Amino acid sequence: MMVFQSFILGNLVSLCMKIINSVVVVGLYYGFLTTFSIGPSYLFLLRARVMDEGEEGTEKKVSATTGFIAGQLMMFISIYYAPLHLALGRPHTITVLALPYLLFHFFWNNHKHFFDYGSTTRNEMRNLRIQCVFLNNLIFQLFNHFILPSSMLARLVNIYMFRCNNKMLFVTSSFVGWLIGHILFMKWVGLVLVWIQQNNSIRSNVLIRSNKYKFLVSELRNSMARIFSILLFITCVYYLGRIPSPIFTKKLKGTSETGGTKQDQEVSTEEAPFPSLFSEEGEDLDKIDEMEEIRVNGKDKINKDDEFHVRTYYNYKTVSENVDGNKENSNLEFFKIKKKEDHFLWFEKPFVTLVFDYKRWNRPNRYIKNDKIENTVRNEMSQYFFYTCQSDGKERISFTYPPTLSTFFEMIKKKIPSFTREKTPSDPISTYWSLINEEKKENLKKEFLNRIEALDKEWSVENILEKTTRFCHNEAKKEYLPKIYDPFLHGISRGRIKKLPPFQIITQTYRKNNIGASWINKIHGLLLKINYHKFEQTIEKFNSKSLSIEKKLSFFSEPQQEEKIDSEEEIKIFKFLFDVVRTHSNDQTRIKNFIDFYEINKKVPRWSYKLISELEELEGENEENVPMEPGIRSRKAKRVVIFTDKEPHNEIYTNLKDNQNSDQKDEMALIRYSQQSDFRREIIKGSMRSQRRKSIIWEFFQAKVHSPLFFDRKDKLFFFSFDIWGLKKKILRNFMWKNKKKKIDKKEEEQSKIEEKRRIEIAETWDSFLFAQIIRGSLLVTQSILRKYIILPLLIIIKNSVRMLLFQFPEWSEDLKDWKREMHIKCTYNGVQLSETEFPKNWLTDGIQIKILFPFYLKPWHKSKFQASQKVRLKKTKDKGEKNDFCFLTVWGMETELPFGSAQKKPSFVEPISKELKKRIKKFKTKPFLVLRIFKKRATILLKVTKEMKNWTLKNFLFIKGKIKDLSKQNLIPLFGPSEIYELNETKKDSIISNQIIHQLSVQNKSMEWTNSSLSEKKKKNLIDRIKTIRNKIDEISKEKQNLTNSCTKLRYDSKIIESSKKIWQTFKRKNTRLIRKSIFFIKFCIEQLSIAIFLGIINIQRITTQLFFESTKIILDKYIYKNDEIGEKKNKKNTIYFISTIKNLISNKKKISYDLCSLSQAYVFYKLSQIKISNFSKLKAVLEYNICITSFFVKNQIKVFFQEQGIFQYELKNKTFLNSEVNQWKNWLRSHYQYNLPQIAWARLVTEKWKKKITQDSLVLNPSLTKEDSYEKKIVDNYKKQNFFEANSLVTPKHNLKKDSIYNIFCYKSIHCTEKNVDMSISIALDNCLVSSFLEKYNIRGIGEIQYRKYLDWRILNFWFTKKVNIEPWVDTKSKQKYINTKVQNYQRIDKITKTGLANQKRNFFDWMGMNEEILNHRITNFEFVFFPEFVLFSSTYKMKPWVIPIKLLLLNFNENINVNKKITRKKKGFIQSNEKKSRRFYNLNKDEKESTGQVEFESDKEQQRNSESALSNQEKNIEENYAESTIKKRKNKKQYKSNTEAELDLFLTRYSRFQLRWNCFFNQKILDNVKVYCLLVRLKNPNEIAISSIERGEMSLDILMIEKNFTFAKLMKKGILIIEPVRLSVQNDGQLIIYRTIGISLVHKNKNKDKISKRYKKKSYIDKKKIDKSITKYQNKTVNRKKNNYDFFVPENILSPKRRREFRILICFNFKKKTARDRNSRFDKNIQNLPTVLHKKKDLDKDKKNLINLKSFLWPNFRLEDLACMNRYWFNTTNGNHFSMIRIHMYTRFPIH
């Protein structure tokens, strides 16, 4: 019962699933979704529902609904019915129908009585309103307009139609679903209307009920139809605005309509004239070609835009021929069979293109040009071609299926009805498919094994290596097509090569294939439709030599010219080109029929226009190759001719008799750009401007157009955002800078900016209006004539006549001289001066400026020259500012300093007169007051004299009075007289106080004497007391005097101290003021630094914390893992691979790298793996150089010996074996770890302890025990011998192409560890030939492939050793002015001829790969040496321009020897490396026996070296020229006739150093433009001295940038600083050869090893034999090993196969096609391995490190192999979308991020 229930339940579920997935349900669902695509047609339907009432309203509702449903039904039927779909889907039909109907409907609703025929009944047909409602809803439903932004809902039905088988049922069900949705929608609208009617709050609105607005409401109801029509019209206009206008469309001319391009559009037989139907080469080129009809007479070709096939319709009318070749009638008549469409083509095509040109540029796309490819492919062209194919044994839809093959299958099915493949079950097919792939792998493996076994048998190279196929167009000379044009190498080409002469390839290739019988196509009858037989023909043996090559040349090269061809020659030519012969098995006769010959190819929609921009038209560079009318809008610009050279420079011009060349003038022109915003932005004319990217404009004249995406990066307005940081900056700036002077300067700067902006606006305004330039130009010329010849002469006459009336001398001569000095120079619109008489070209339309030099200003009088001194004039100029002696004329006759600037203030004529009058009046006023001034002066003198006399008399009177008193005192008291006088004399000098005391005592004594004369005793006592007091006073005074003298002496000493301290204080004060003044800058600097540090700290907080966290966790985990391991470490050798240069950058930047090995780059992983122990490195060699699952068992014991000698193996590992792992190992190991997301412990176990410690270091620390001397200097010869193989095989490879695609394609052939060797293995080239063509010259860089990283070069000093010039002065003469073009190439190639003899004059390393990285990064570039040695400037500039051509030995060797500079240098040298005896003894201590045993080639002399290097350089340049695009070469050929040496030099410079950009110094831009303006004027003048001097004084012409020398050099320009050469930063693509070379060729040698060991190591070596491969490399074997000759030069054995087979071999090996279990192993493979005699024995006792390395190796190698496949899928699998390998990327990289 339970089983029955489950059975019923299962049936119900399956039934439900079937119902849900049925066509009906899906159609109902999609139809219901279509209802929500609401368009303008709903407006009519809703209007009929809402507005119309009554019986007529009901009929209108019914008709509207019926029309709406009928229109939708027609849309659904058009999906299924193709004619209706074409009618409704064509844009021009809808456009033609929509516009007239919209106009009719608009006028219908605006004119009410348009169809009013009076009183008619309701049901009569005269009343067309109901019919119009039906038509409105029907037609507007077909217009497919959408109000919603996306129309995806309406197109869902169209999309699902591609997946549905029962299409009619699906269309019906989808229509029913739409009808259900429509009914529901209309019911919902009805419910909303009922709700509105029932809701009183809406109906009882005050506005509606009020009487005031009743009239407005009624008018609104009456005019609803008009409102609806207006809304509908606006919607339709908006919709039509998104598409281009059908009539006023810019019609672009196709390439066939333009002259000079017909020859380019040849049939695609340039590389393969008759490609087979299945050849990929023909297919690739056929994709390019457009469909053309070729007329037989060669008159014209018609380019048809609809298809791109090549059709040839011919009717061959001949008589049957017998088998033996007897001709009955040999006349062949060719005539064109016209189709029916050709009769009305002249009418139909112009009408269609008038309405809508479907091939023009509708979208405003960018037109990306390509000089080497013709018309570009349309963007809407899908690169995919879908067809069914077998993949994994099952039928699948392939998106890259070859379209030719699908077309072929379709044709076969039509011709052979039984051509149907029986479908078999999927499992047998799948197994069969996998078996086929397995069989392919086995066959490839067997072939590979056979070729390797042939190596042991010492076969020749030709029998071992698989040949690659190249396209040869000259077998005799072995000339091949360039790799970029080789279809075998380049792959699919999407463009046609320009101007390849097709007759060369046709004549040479066809001659080879057609000397026998004509081409017979066996399956031709199956593919072509044969309707009737016209004639019979036998196989004709014809010789192609009988064809006239001259006729072929004329036929192909000049198709435009009419040419008569004889009938026989015409027969032969077209028989040669178009005969196709068919075979019949039953009949001996051959039938030639009317043939429709279709080239089976893919339709590639290609733009039929080859457009040029307006700027290119203005420049006029490509007038021969481009149409006359530009198709791309450029920035608004005008071509202004500034100089026209009417006299030819060379005699070539005089000999030309061509009318075009004779009429053509040599013009020099400048492009004047408009200053307003460039809104056109290189869009193509006729494209929809409204569909361009939206741009934000907030100013009327805006400098640049900004996208909304980047608008936030601009300075916003205040209402857009509030920038707090900007406000802080402004506040700080205002706070720090409060200087008034700087504020004034800022205001002046802002004012000048505003003035400049105003001038630009005025100029653009004049340039934008129609006829404005004509009006302005005529006004300017009128003002110039009026000023020069009417106004100024009239003013001169009036002035001089007035002077004569005032009885003054007239100044006719001075005024006329100034008037004649004034010059009116005609200038272009932007101010370039021409001359007085020459007007600019098209000056009425382009604009004109008139510049007045030395303008005339009327002066009332002229001063003499000696009146105003020079100092006064200088002072005036300093005060008033420098005043220019020129101006520009305005429209109103005013003068401005700059065009469109504000008017200048003229020097006033009345102002000097008024100043002179003021002076005269002032003088007149001062005369009456002159007497008073003199009297006043005399009165002051008299008063001074009287005052002095008065003082003198008073002094004398007092003196006499004093004398009288003294005499009286002496007579009365004689005893006291002398003492008083003495006292007075003493005290007068000492102090005033003592004098006062003595005077008082004397007065008291006199008074006492007068009153008491009788008392003698009292007198005596008084006298005694007086004497005592006087003596006491004298003693006190003497003591005080002594104290005063002592104090004075002390004060003098202290005064010096005070003065010195005062000086110190003054200096301190001065320093303090300076410190205060400068503290502002210091505070500002500190604030800025602090803010930056805070900002960076905030940013880096998260990163620092996470980094510290992960580092701490890693350290803890590492300690935990290795806690129990052995700590003791043995001293092992280190093998450092000098790996890819990007690793050096990575280490020098001191970046810390985590253990996430999947996320590391492949180069870094290999570099770090090289630092493991020697025992592990031996296994790494197997990983790096051999494929894991196949080639490892080919490793023999001799290779181990070789590695042991190199220090890669230890001696104990001599008998150990390589590990032979399979691809399944890494799969099994990775299956256990989901998505490689391993824990930290598992990741850490993959690496050794020493590697773990190394990887956590900040930078690479070199081992101090390893010295550069051991690694380079002591092993120079050994390295030479070790590198002999690599140089002989890898350096001689042909140069890669310069094109990016070709380099990618070649890189696909190489893969990681593989190198593409040359097939030619001859070792006849000497070793010296390889010196110039070094690894640095390999094309490892995209685009040029010759530049190596500059950081390896020690460019502190450039030292040169001149082999053939003893004295440097006559060779490099800095003062000579010879033509530089002749000596440039020779001088610049001297750097290639540098020998290694005297590379260093000091003890400095010229090159240092180990230690120069950090030093060069911090090294300052100085050129002070060149000031004293100008001879070296040439070589220094040489290195700057061409740093990549450096011999390889200079990078591998260091020279630390001191060479005496004063020692006499001789030219004779015994060998290449010998510079002196000491050096040769030290480095090359080799005996003759050793040289003979090694078989080393003796180094050649310097002459041969020089010749070899020159030949290598010439070959290099030849290859570069060969790989260069032929179109550019032809363009260059057209311009080879240079008019001057400067032009030739510039062309040579740009061709040789095109990867270095030549940039002006930014400071010279304005100076150069100013100089050009002055030059244009000076060239036209006969005596330009005066104007030249004045322009120099004004600063218009700068003398520092003048090229005084006629033949200047680029080195001089760089020395002056005018030109700056900047190398373009190109990405490096590392070559596999370089990796192997650095891995094996260079290895460090331990310092403890003796020199004897180094010299003895390579005593036994093999000799070179040109016939065998094993002699191309010198073997390195020990004494104990027998000298057995085996072949080990193929480090990657896969190189035996061709690149194509090599790729297939790798893919089959990397992907295992069998479904195996996790532990399944390939038993057959193991069995084969054990049977081989060279298999290395395995051992079970693997140590821990070996097991870890096995896991690491099995994980890394296939992982990165998949990465390479993912990167190269574009070229291997013909897919350009990288997302196809997204799943691989997901599984390759772990989830946790890198910190």
From Swiss-Prot:
The chain crosses the membrane at residues 19-39, 68-88, 91-111, 133-153, 176-196, 227-247. One of its GO terms (biological process) is protein transport. It is found in: Plastid, Chloroplast inner membrane. GO terms for cellular component: chloroplast inner membrane. Residues 1490-1517 are annotated as: Disordered. It is a multi-pass membrane protein. Residues 1508-1517 have a biased composition (Polar residues). It comes from the Eukaryota. The keyword rRNA-binding does not apply. Its main location: plastid. Pfam families: Ycf1 (PF05758). Keywords: Chloroplast, Membrane, Plastid, Plastid inner membrane, Protein transport, Transmembrane, Transmembrane helix, Transport. Involved in protein precursor import into chloroplasts. May be part of an intermediate translocation complex acting as a protein-conducting channel at the inner envelope. There is a partial copy of the N-terminus (positions 1-343) of ycf1 in the inverted repeat (BAF50335). Part of the Tic complex. Belongs to the TIC214 family. This is Protein TIC 214.
